[in-house]
């Protein structure tokens, strides 16, 4: 019996360590997801340095407490899974959002981003925001637009002078 308790303590410590390092994490109900969908989500999340765990509520509550994060005890119930973002803070939110929108029975429970607890509504709002790379490309296209228009104007003037 003590060996099982020791394994649980090690598991809690492992999850707590990951939560301390995490830039974000998302807790969601997975009970209506098929095994195939859960595996697909796991694969998508693991493409970068992020991880997904299906945990017992008690283990997750203890790990969150041990990581020094407060305010999650009331939200964690039913069958839940957690996606932890170690490098990209927004990838876990966006990855889970795809499954939340595809299957209305899969629900956000809560999340954590930049030392703040997020509600399900806040997670939904964040998930539809463009990523950092998308924002950079939008910004660069805005910067290039005046130069591009000027170039086309010069080309039109050159074409009219050639005729």
Curated annotation (Swiss-Prot):
InterPro entries the UniProt entry points to: Ribosomal_uL10, Ribosomal_uL10-like_sf, Ribosomal_uL10_bac, Ribosomal_uL10_bac_type
Superkingdom, taxonomy of origin: Bacteria
Tagged with keyword Iron-sulfur: no
GO cellular component terms attached to this protein's record: ribonucleoprotein complex; ribosome
Key word Ribosomal protein present: yes
NCBIfam families in alphabetical order: PRK00099.1-1 (NF000955)
Entry function: Forms part of the ribosomal stalk, playing a central role in the interaction of the ribosome with GTP-bound translation factors.
Subunit structure of this chain's protein: Part of the ribosomal stalk of the 50S ribosomal subunit. The N-terminus interacts with L11 and the large rRNA to form the base of the stalk. The C-terminus forms an elongated spine to which L12 dimers bind in a sequential fashion forming a multimeric L10(L12)X complex.
Family, as annotated: Belongs to the universal ribosomal protein uL10 family.
Protein name as catalogued: Large ribosomal subunit protein uL10
Native species: Mycoplasmoides gallisepticum (strain R(low / passage 15 / clone 2)) (Mycoplasma gallisepticum)
Encoding gene, per UniProt annotation: rplJ
